[in-house]
Design a protein with these regions (language model features):
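Conserved catalytic-core helix/loop/strand module for nucleotide-ribose chemistry
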Residues: 2-8, 12-201, 207-310
Length: 310
């Protein structure tokens, strides 16, 4: 029997489903937000203040990229006060997330149920979180006692090591290299691409697969859109909030994958489950699958077979 290998990828939608207000919009509307409309310290603060007033969905990292991108018509030279303010912004986000993760969680949330099933399954030896929160603390609050390992992709608030910023393929104006995530002193390499390549099954929960993080997943989705045999297909389950986010996610996949959506869907066991008004049949099938395809079930089957042979 081939060794099973499963991967869990966690995005901010996971923490939001727990009941925490961890979106950038939530941060921008909190008392921790260091941006002020009047008396801005630097052009970066002024730019963020303008954007927060006009954009319904406030994607902080995309706005940082937009501000520092090469070719903007104003502020061509890096302002010396921008970097200290960026550090202040990052520290403020750290304090905000810390106070959010100190709150209780919704123990009946889909996020908790999925985490319990994943940990109990036993084959998820690769768990990655793009969030800054403590997954062990979440597990304890959820009543999960089994041991598991996971990796932070962008640091964590517990170690004051969060990484915010922009991708490495966007050309930035001179002097704004500090905004690149891969340039952060806290950045650590990880084998996420290899784990995705080698796994039989992957579960995404609450990750938008947006272009800022898409380089982590680009090779995986490209490969799964060019399967040459049935055995190359994988089980891919994506948990997202609602139908609006489902369509956004599919559109993002289509754009980033050169329009190769049909092969991706047909050559893999791809399911998208919405956490608001979910398809209960689809949800139950997911949980039943993880229970059936688990280390415990396989051990029970082997023990049963051994007893029959004696």
């Amino acid at each position: 029997m081939a060794m099973r290998k499963k991967v869990l990828i966690i995005g901010n939608g996971f923490d939001l489903n727990l009941g925490w207000k961890t979106s950038y919009r939530d941060f921008a509307e909190s008392d921790y937000w260091p941006v002020h409309d009047v008396g801005s310290k630097c052009p970066l603060e002024e730019y963020l203040a303008k954007k927060v007033g006009i954009e319904r969905w406030y994607d902080l990292e995309s706005i940082l990229r937009e501000y520092a991108a090469d070719g903007r018509s104003s502020h061509f030279k890096a302002h010396p006060a921008d970097e200290p303010f960026f550090n202040e912004l990052r520290d403020a986000l750290t304090h905000y997330i810390k106070q959010e993760e100190s709150k209780q969680i919704d123990e009946d949330s889909v996020a908790v149920k999925v985490l319990k099933s994943v940990v109990s399954n036993g084959y998820f030896n690769s768990i990655y979180t793009f969030n800054y929160t403590d997954l062990y603390s979440i597990a304890e609050k959820a009543g999960i006692h089994e041991r598991f390992d996971y990796k932070y992709v962008h640091g964590n608030v517990g170690c004051n090591s969060i990484i915010i910023g922009v991708d490495d393929h966007t050309d930035l104006r001179e002097g704004y290299g500090y905004l690149r995530k891969v340039f952060s002193e806290h950045y650590r390499s990880n084998p996420i691409r290899y784990d995705l390549q080698e796994c039989n099954e992957v579960v995404f929960f609450g990750h938008s697969l947006g272009d800022m993080d898409y380089p982590y997943f680009r090779d995986f989705f490209y490969t799964q859109s060019h399967c040459t045999s049935r055995k190359d297909g994988k089980i891919i389950t994506i948990f997202t909030k609602d139908n609006h986010s489902r369509i956004q996610l599919l559109e993002q996949l289509r754009i980033m994958n050169a329009g190769q959506m049909e092969p991706l869907q047909n050559d893999n066991d791809l399911k998208i489950i919405m956490t608001e008004a979910p398809d209960n049949v689809l949800m139950n099938l997911f949980f039943e699958h993880l229970k059936k395809d688990s280390i415990q079930t396989h051990n029970d089957d082997m023990n049963s077979l051994a007893s029959m042979l004696h």
